[in-house]
Amino acid sequence: MVGVFRLEGHSVRLQSLRGIAALCVAVGHAFTVMRNGRIEDAHFTLRPGNALLAAGELLFQPNTAVILFYVLSGFVLGESLRRRAAPNERSHLGAFGVRRLWRLLPVMWLSILFAAAVAVLLRDATFAGTTSWFDQFSSVAVSPAILLENLLGLSHSINSVLWSIQIELVMIVLLPLMAWLSARTGLWLDGVMVGALYLGAIEFWGVVPNFVLFAYCFYLGAALPKFLSNAMVAR
């Protein structure tokens, strides 16, 4: 009988894959600055002048990369939860939360402060050839109250791309529950859970909070060891 697949220790390959996904997101957002080559636009027409940009956007597809990154996060963090020992469950979960906050908050705060400075310095500035998504950064409202709200992770109004970090913060609480549930269910029920969360995301897109929409990615990642084990048995 083959046991459940386990990730033992730090995996350079997995971390590299997460890094590639993060890089695709960053480069993909750079493409959203320019009007040419916006393949999401309903009126997009492929022309020689925008073909290179369109190809680059397909190669560095940020939406797909975000999903891959979240699945890998669910996998790596779920395995970290199972692997690390602690005197009791409360200490175990507390240590997990502290580690995650230490990794996420400093970078998030630095990004917010930089974006706030840019918003103040470039207030009402205009740039030729940029998209409305980029132009909105020159009209971002910045005040002590708004800054505090963003620093606490309650809003991403100053730097809109930080919606993805907000999801990671919520998952500090939800991922241990997902890992606990997946450890006590069968493979078929895991598949049903992932499918239900995915269909719910499609049905309620734009209605429910973002962390609900992407919960299926993290649950799939947490359950991935069982799917991998089943694939190895099938061989």
Where would I find each of the regions flagged by the language model?
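Short, Lys/Arg-rich, polar N-terminal cytosolic tail immediately upstream
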Residues: M1-R13
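Membrane-helix interface linkers and caps
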Residues: V2-F5, L77-R100, M232
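Functionally critical transmembrane alpha-helices in membrane proteins and complexes, commonly lining
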Residues: V12-R82
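Aromatic-enriched alpha-helical transmembrane segments of multi-pass intramembrane proteins
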Residues: Q15, A21-C24, S138-R235
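Hydrophobic residues within membrane-embedded alpha-helical segments of Major Facilitator Superfamily
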Residues: C24, L68-Y70, V76, W109, ...
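Transmembrane helix-loop junctions in multipass membrane proteins, especially transporters and channels
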Residues: G37, D41, R83-A85, A119-A128, ...
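Membrane-interface helix-loop-helix regions
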Residues: R47-L58, E89, L93-A95, L104-L169, ...
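Transmembrane alpha-helical segments in integral membrane proteins
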Residues: I67-R83, L122, L169-A179
